[in-house]
């Protein structure tokens, strides 16, 4: 359940949402086959961008958090509530439809246990208004970039993708992490016969 808004103009676009990302599972622990419990997870986010297909930039933000009151006390003792803040940028730059660079990078600040003690010293306190760092928090990065060349007689591209270990986004159901995609290169040569 949720609500979303979207605006699109010729080059400018913006979107926002708020809603339930995951429903709570609160089965009776005396049940012989209870399902795995889970907190109700709320999320909100927005994105804004400018540009067309050839040259564009978009910024997006996602905030997700578990509602502790959505789970019975007996389950709360076994399962930690979590929260997450993701900030990302994606863009594309091209030159005369011959050379193009695309990139998508994101930073994820993830807390595995919202009830863990707060970090009160160092650089982590600078961001308290945006994300409250706890002793179970971690910040990780993920991204990819691709460079493509298109000429009448050859098409070539090179790509790099990296996801740091323990990268987590509560806005996705599954994320591969600790992943380095080593620069594959694709080349296609066009040959004309007369």
Describe each region flagged by the PLM.
Residues 2-194:
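Signature for the C-terminal beta-barrel architecture of outer-membrane proteins
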């Amino acid at each position: 359940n949720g609500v979303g808004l979207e605006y699109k103009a010729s080059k400018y676009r913006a979107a926002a949402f708020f809603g339930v990302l995951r429903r709570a599972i609160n089965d009776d622990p005396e049940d012989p086959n209870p399902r795995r419990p889970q907190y109700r997870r709320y999320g909100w986010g927005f994105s804004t961008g400018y540009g067309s297909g050839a040259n564009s930039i978009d910024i997006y933000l996602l905030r997700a958090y578990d509602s502790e009151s959505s789970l019975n006390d007996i389950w709360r003792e076994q399962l930690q509530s979590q929260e997450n803040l993701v900030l990302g940028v994606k863009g594309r730059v091209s030159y005369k439809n011959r050379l193009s660079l695309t990139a998508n990078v994101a930073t994820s600040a993830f807390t595995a246990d919202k009830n863990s003690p707060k970090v009160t010293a160092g650089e982590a306190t600078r961001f308290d208004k945006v994300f409250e760092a706890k002793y179970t928090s971690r910040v990780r990065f993920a991204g990819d970039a691709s460079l493509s060349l298109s000429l009448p007689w050859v098409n070539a591209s090179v790509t790099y993708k990296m996801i740091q270990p323990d990268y987590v986004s509560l806005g996705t159901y599954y994320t591969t992490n600790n992943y380095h995609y080593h620069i594959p290169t694709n080349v296609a040569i066009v040959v004309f016969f007369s």
